[in-house]
């Protein structure tokens, strides 16, 4: 994913320097030729025994195709038309997984196919697709990757709250563990048992021109969760899920540390339908910095911009620029809270710790929302008020107004129309400075 720049030669250089330049060009040519060779190598999974009939498990055949391509330096593992039933698969460096239009990679519903592993510092089941310490991975093709997660969702609803509930362990659909240079494009990812796409401690991840889907009531089916990752670019995605459409994370509740931040993330030209919105948190002990979002349309999401944490999982959160957002029938267009998941009616300041959230420098420009239930919530902790929130050209029509507590907001051309009650409710240590 580099940019080739023209090489300017100084013909007055010494012969030795010229030889070094020519040598570099020769090596670059070898690298380019090797890359083209990798791209040209195709391992069709049917040649390794895959049936694609939706009944026989094709796990071994598909993994054999991945391993064979990787052993030769990389290539394309191709799934043509058909339904390829599989357990967990492990991707390798320099592999393109191409799921053609008309093909579905379908996750097995057999719990025994998913070994228990340590993942994100906790117990989990092996993801349907994963890669560890890998680079230059591509997933594309116009087809679908389906986690087939309904049995896990049903188990969660049947046993939620029960002690020692082992069915709470569910496989994620795609985990990129300490990977770099990843491209996911033109593919539908759907119906994961749990979080769908998780870049974990990864760098340079591009996700574009696709769909991520799950039923509105499917539990914890987050669309994309960058976790302690950097340089993640998400664009032209339709995300319709049962939980956060996107949730940027870093760290775990009560994390002992150390934790790394998520940084330099851009989200552009996307549509978010059912789900909990464009979220930061709640697990952000490592912090989240430099997030940019533009030209996002929200329809029927529970929240729009959602920044959430609490005293047992917070960190330094800020330098966000969100602009050109449109929202229809969104529950709460702006939800910024250091009291996730519930805001108490009364509270007093607590000692500041390593996990106390600190929200700052959150800038929202050109937002228009209609049909909202509650215009907004901006509520900080008394020991860590939210600072430097700017609302510029923001217009919200809602049933209820906006509530601000332990937060300082600067507003320019900010309008809230509430069908009932006061459009602005200012509680303890709250300030809206209108410019």
Name every feature range the model reports, one short phrase each:
Residues 1-18:
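N-terminal secretory signal peptides that target proteins for export/translocation
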Residues 5-9, 23, 412:
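Intrinsically disordered, low-complexity Ser/Thr- and Pro-rich stretches
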Residues 22-34:
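Bacterial N-terminal signal peptides
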Residues 36-435:
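Extracellular/periplasmic carbohydrate-active domains that bind, remodel
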């Amino acid at each position: 994913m580099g940019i080739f720049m023209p090489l300017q030669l100084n013909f007055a250089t010494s012969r030795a320097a010229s030889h070094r330049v020519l040598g570099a060009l020769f090596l670059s040519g070898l690298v380019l030729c090797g890359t083209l060779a990798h791209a040209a190598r195709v391992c069709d999974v049917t040649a390794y025994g895959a049936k694609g009939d939706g009944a026989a498990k094709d796990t071994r055949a598909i993994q054999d195709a991945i391993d064979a391509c990787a052993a030769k330096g990389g290539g394309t593992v191709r799934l043509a038309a058909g339904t390829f039933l599989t357990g967990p698969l492990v991707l390798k460096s320099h592999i393109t997984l191409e799921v053609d239009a008309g093909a579905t990679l379908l996750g097995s519903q057999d719990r025994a196919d998913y070994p228990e592993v340590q993942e994100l510092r906790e117990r989990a089941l092996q993801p349907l697709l994963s890669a560890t310490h890998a680079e230059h991975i591509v997933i594309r093709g116009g087809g679908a990757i389906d986690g087939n997660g309904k049995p896990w969702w049903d188990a969660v609803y049947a046993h939620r709250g029960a002690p020692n509930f082992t069915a709470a362990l569910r496989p994620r659909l795609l985990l990129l563990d300490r990977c770099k240079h990843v491209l996911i494009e033109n593919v539908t990812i759907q119906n994961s048992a749990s979080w769908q796409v998780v870049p974990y401690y990864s760098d340079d991840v591009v996700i574009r021109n696709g769909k991520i889907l799950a039923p509105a009531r499917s539990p914890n089916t987050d669309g994309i969760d960058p976790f302690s990752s950097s340089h993640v670019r998400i664009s032209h995605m339709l995300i319709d899920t049962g939980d956060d459409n996107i949730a940027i994370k870093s760290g775990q509740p009560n994390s002992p540390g150390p934790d790394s931040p998520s940084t330099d993330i851009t989200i552009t030209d996307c549509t978010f339908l059912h789900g909990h919105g464009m979220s930061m948190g709640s697990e952000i002990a490592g912090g989240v910095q430099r997030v940019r979002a533009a030209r996002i349309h929200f329809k029927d999401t529970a929240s729009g911009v959602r920044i959430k944490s609490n005293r047992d999982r917070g960190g330094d959160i800020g330098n966000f620029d969100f602009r050109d957002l449109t929202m229809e029938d969104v529950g709460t267009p702006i939800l910024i809270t250091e009291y996730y998941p519930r805001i108490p009616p009364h509270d007093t300041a607590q000692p500041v710790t390593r996990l106390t959230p600190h929200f700052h420098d959150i800038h929202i420009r050109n937002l228009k929302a209609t049909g909202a239930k509650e215009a907004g919530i901006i509520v900080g902790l008394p020991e860590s008020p939210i600072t430097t929130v700017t609302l510029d050209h923001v217009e919200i029509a809602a049933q209820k107004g906006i509530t601000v507590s332990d937060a300082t907001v600067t507003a320019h051309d900010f309008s809230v129309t509430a069908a009932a009650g006061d459009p602005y409710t200012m509680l303890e240590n709250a300030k809206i400075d209108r410019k």
